[in-house]
Amino acid sequence: MAAGRMILDVGCANGDILAPLAKVHEIHGVDIAPGLVERAIKNGIHAVCHNLEGGPLPYPAGKFDAIFCGETIEHQVDTDWLMFEINRVLKSGGKLVLTFPNIRTILGLGMMLFFDLPPMYAARYRSMHFRDFTLRTIKIVLKAHGFRFERAIGSAFYLPKIEEFWSPLATYLPSWAYTVVVIATKQTDSIYSSESIMPTRLY
């Protein structure tokens, strides 16, 4: 990506992830926690405090060349509103990099099959995660909101004691990785409806 681009970090926390890019790009960020926003500003991020479910992102349509949304989508009750707003402030042809905790993991399937427990990082009782995703459902979400899926990369497998041995394979088997990085391109504008319901049949 050429220098001088406008990039938004949705759910930026303390800004550590995109701070290295602030030397060559204009990085903006939003987060709900005032203390984290203050730290993000110190890291060179143009950060503001904002509740993602409390109203529109505080930016005009088509402002950003790229958007990063890391480990945030699972914390939102209204997934469609989040994706609509990301689409709105992203330029046509702009890139979205989205990461999420994948519930379709070897350990997660074992927890459900043998212990009658939800997978790690799932929307469990008293969890801060409100929505569960797999790579397939994320692709459905992206398509529903005007994005073209480009590629997915798995970050690691969670397999105690043998994680270091198996984790390199996650790059090539993202649908089994416990964290997935997805890259997508905005093709069309999104339409939001508070009554929209994702189908629960076999997609």
Segments from the language model and where they lie:
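Local beta-strand N-terminus motif with an aromatic residue
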Residues: G4, F64-D65
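Class I SAM-dependent methyltransferase SAM/SAH-binding core
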Residues: N14-G55
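A conserved beta-strand element that flanks and buttresses the S-adenosyl-L-methionine
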Residues: F68
